[in-house]
Amino acid sequence: MAVLALLFCLATFPSCILSQVQLKESGPGLVAPSQSLSITCTVSGFSLTGYGVNWVRQPPGKGLEWLGTIWGNGSTDYNSTLKSRLTITKDNSKSQVFLKMNSLQTDDTARYYCASVSIYYYGRSDKYFTLDYWGQGTSVTVSS
């Protein structure tokens, strides 16, 4: 009976399998120019071995900027313009994903978000995915 209920849930509401998903970012708040930024994203409600997690930021008054993704198998994709400064890692056992960015400048001031990937597919040369679950974000200011 429980199996039938689960199948009904999945068939009717595909997102129900991730209905309890939560993501929470924690960061330093203030970072001095030229220093490094480290942010942790702690997730619950799903396993990091089965889903990708993205890092996205939004500078004040500007749009969202994708930083990178770490996939369930541990492989990573990065924004090509920031790739040399970024490292994304994770600890599956602690359900945590880590963003490290080096050589910060004032234009790195932004709100930083982690977001989980629920659906993705490959195009001819690109990956496409939906970011259905977001953390509340953590504000980072780069200033001396």
UniProtKB/Swiss-Prot annotation:
Keyword line: Adaptive immunity, Immunity, Immunoglobulin, Signal
Gene Ontology molecular function terms on file: antigen binding
Keyword Signal among UniProt keywords: yes
Cellular component annotations (GO), alphabetically ordered: extracellular region; immunoglobulin complex
CDD domains: IgV_H
Signal peptide (UniProt feature, chain positions): 1-19
Domain Ig-like: 20-130
Keyword Signal: yes
GO BP annotation list: immunoglobulin mediated immune response
Note: The sequence shown is translated from a differentiated gene isolated from a myeloma that secretes IgG2b.
The protein, known as: Ig heavy chain V region MOPC 141
Species the sequence originates in: Mus musculus (Mouse)
